[in-house]
Amino acid sequence: MLLRFTKMHGLGNDFMVLDLISQHAHVQPKHAKQWGDRHTGVGFDQLLIVEPPSHPDVDFRYRIFNSDGSEVEQCGNGARCFARFVLDKRLTTKKTIRVETKSGVIELRVQNDGQVCVNMGAPRLEPAQVPFQAEQAALTYRVDVEGQSVELAALSMGNPHAVLRVDNVDSAPVHTLGPKLEHHPRFPQRVNVGFLQVLDRKHARLRVWERGAGETQACGTGACAAAVAAIRQGWMDSPVQLELPGGKLSIEWAGEGQPVMMTGPAARVYEGQVRL
């Protein structure tokens, strides 16, 4: 059978979006891996699936697969594209929607200027919630990587993140240290790795090595995690403007126990069909 899909991106973080409300199919990890290949498939960082909700107090269910076939809990840039998609496809007329993910419910709001604001929920800071192996919670942790000691913050935005401060993101070891930390045994579910260069109290640059996808043009949850880490350590003040390779995101966080608000663009690229 043929399935209709939409190719979208949020700051260059690109997605294949499938509506499984008006069309019915059983999509499996092998399909995500097949379609995700940039040479022989559609090519994307993540596959986003729109499904009917399983609870009456939410509008949709949101599932996410990496291009390696692994299903993940959360994707911030994808959430913005999800909100634009369900409006564009007239699956809802609401400008504010509640969406269930593997890690909980998030709220998405499409603004009049076309930007999308996502309530990502409160960050989870306890090591067991990341999950990360540590005896007790701390602002930063020391992790040994092949004899090198690396200082990082570890937290969850519904998915696990490590954040490292660097002097210059252009020369940061994203492609060498990134995969080593992703698969480090202290992160039992693997981890997304952010390399953060603080410019001043309000502005920073960020590159992210994403679990299961490698370096991407932008990572929404990575931007949220980096902002939280920077604010907690006293480096920056909310709201924070983060510049990623694909563009800029605005992140607001009022402190522990409070939700992280992420605002940024979402763009449609093209429509297509793929064989299941």
Swiss-Prot record:
Pathway: Amino-acid biosynthesis; L-lysine biosynthesis via DAP pathway; DL-2,6-diaminopimelate from LL-2,6-diaminopimelate: step 1/1. One of its GO terms (molecular function) is diaminopimelate epimerase activity. One of its GO terms (biological process) is lysine biosynthetic process via diaminopimelate. The record marks 270 as: Important for dimerization. Its main location: cytoplasm. The active site is at residues 75, 219. The record marks 161, 210 as: Could be important to modulate the pK values of the two catalytic cysteine residues. Keywords: Amino-acid biosynthesis, Cytoplasm, Isomerase, Lysine biosynthesis. Substrate binds at residues 13, 46, 66, 76-77, 159, 192, 210-211, 220-221. Its EC number is 5.1.1.7. Catalyzes the stereoinversion of LL-2,6-diaminopimelate (L,L-DAP) to meso-diaminopimelate (meso-DAP), a precursor of L-lysine and an essential component of the bacterial peptidoglycan. This is Diaminopimelate epimerase. It comes from Ectopseudomonas mendocina (strain ymp). The lineage of its organism: Bacteria, Pseudomonadati, Pseudomonadota, Gammaproteobacteria, Pseudomonadales. The gene is dapF.
